[in-house]
Amino acid sequence: MAGREKRRRVAALDGEERRRRQEEAATLLHRIRGLVRWVVAEVAAGRSPTVALHRYQNYCSSASAAAASPCACSYDVPVGTDVLSLLHRGSHASRLNVLLRVLLVVQQLLQQNKHCSKRDIYYMYPSIFQEQAVVDRAINDICVLFKCSRHNLNVVPVAKGLVMGWIRFLEGEKEVYCVTNVNAAFSIPVSIEAIKDVVSVADYILIVEKETVFQRLANDKFCERNRCIVITGRGYPDIPTRRFLRYLVEQLHLPVYCLVDADPYGFDILATYKFGSLQLAYDANFLRVPDIRWLGVFTSDFEDYRLPDCCLLHLSSEDRRKAEGILSRCYLHREAPQWRLELEAMLQKGVKFEIEALSACSISFLSEEYIPKKIKQGRHI
């Protein structure tokens, strides 16, 4: 009886959530139609319609940031405004023209309750858009203009992330039961809105930078011996991976650890999870995981675990430029001074190495020694 009552409550909540999303979609569609009608009326009257777009910036790389002085960067407050005019010549007119064309596609998607990818939109007007980045910017502009996220526009990416471990959930009507084989990889859902009934007995979430490391842990049956959820974004994480991680953190309230290569690009991937990306600054506060813990690998691990010299690689000039650029970001001075010190040590020593270098100790050293002991002993920053 209690079980049936619980299922009824869950069904009622799912129904309420469905209605809320339908109302949000209807409201957004109404606002889009209103803007399009206004633009058409302005042009018909011989006037130049203008659209004001807030400009967001979640971090900067200025000299003042390096001096640890205050800057205007914020996760939820705009730092400026761009005014786009359709009839003026120049880049702003082109930008507004592209925005309106993409907006018409979005309007059609919402009216017909259909979805498409950014690439689909590009191929609708390739001679006008010229390159994919133009469409990407227009989608970001629309999100800023209507204060919504990309998924609200029915523009969906192709998810590349993977998950395994002690978790099960429903994705629409599909059951995703990772717990039946905790070492098997499952694709991360494209739409977080389709997820419901999440259940987990995990103690923590582990993010690994690369699929090769993810597969190493799967082969070593890491999740059988450690009650956890393992996720990889397979390099720089896409939006579905970041949204999925943020969703799990909010639902399960578990600590999150991140394992990346000891190089500037690994550090940048780690920073993307914690602080968000500059391209999606307007949405960073809803995608980032501010309490993520850096588990490794650290430059100091090379000496601590007595790895052979052949595992070390010298930082290239490109690596150095990347590291110096990251070091100037204001959030490292403001929110993660220990992370900054670790990156400075890497730059000072001029070396880097990959997670897989730990296999020099033994093939399963990463899964049997490095990760479990570091988490148990609290050796993370």
Curated annotation (Swiss-Prot):
Protein name in the entry: Meiotic recombination protein SPO11-1
Any one of the GO CC terms: nuclear chromosome
Subcellular location(s) of the protein: Nucleus
Other observations noted: Plants silencing TPO6A1 have no apparent growth defects during vegetative development, but most of the plant are completely sterile due to empty and shrunken mature pollen grains, and defect in the macrospores.
One Gene Ontology molecular-function label: metal ion binding
Binding of Mg(2+), residues: 209, 261
EC numbers for this chain: 5.6.2.2
Main location: nucleus
Similarity remark: Belongs to the TOP6A family.
Signal peptide residue numbers: none
GO biological process: chiasma assembly; double-strand break repair via homologous recombination; meiotic DNA double-strand break formation; meiotic DNA double-strand break processing; reciprocal meiotic recombination
Keywords: DNA-binding, Isomerase, Magnesium, Metal-binding, Nucleus, Topoisomerase
Catalytic activity: ATP-dependent breakage, passage and rejoining of double-stranded DNA
Keyword Cell wall biogenesis/degradation tagged: no
Gene3D superfamilies named in the record: 3.40.1360.10, Winged helix-like DNA-binding domain superfamily/Winged helix DNA-binding domain
Residue ranges occupied by any Topo IIA-type catalytic domain in the UniProt entry: 23-162
